Amino acid sequence: MAANLVVNAAGLGAQRLAESINGLNPKTIPDRYLARGCYFTISGKPPFQRLIYPVPEPGGLGVHVTLDMGGGIRFGPDVEWIDRVDYEIKPERADSFYSAIRKYYPELKDGTLQPGYAGVRPKITEKGSAAGDFLIQGPEEHKIKGLVNMYGIESPGLTASLALADIVAHKLGLPEIKDGTT
């Protein structure tokens, strides 16, 4: 495939896609590490009407509370370093959730947590290392005109998507857009 502009924002597949780009120096491609995050839910009336974020833990924000659009509640995610993409939620992981959640919700009863869902975050730093920021490489870094590679873009990337788009546009030398006009 030939293109004038390519933005590699493939998330978990960003490194693999970058490896397929002709002329890209493999040394510019960071290693990929995988961190599964599981969520558990509870049934019944949610005990909270607001988000709760405990003090962050290494590798993530800790088991926090989020509310979904249907009025339900989710606890998570945790951080489990894995070797391959795997979305299985092991029920025994609930044990560590109970202790984490009881730090801010001591009334949580045993047996109330139910597996919700899991996601896999693309990390660019390995277990035990300080958390890495997003890595966004343009032509200045890898010497290929019209290419931007984005690595380690995890869930905050959704919140920061407009700012990330500005960074990508700048790296590609595109004109700035103001108030919907160029």
Residue ranges and their predicted role:
Residues 161-179:
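Internal hydrophobic alpha-helix adjacent to the cofactor/substrate pocket in enzyme cavities
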Residues 57-60, 148-161:
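Glycine-rich phosphate/pyrophosphate-binding beta-alpha loops
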Residues 1-143:
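Active-site substrate-recognition segment that forms the wall
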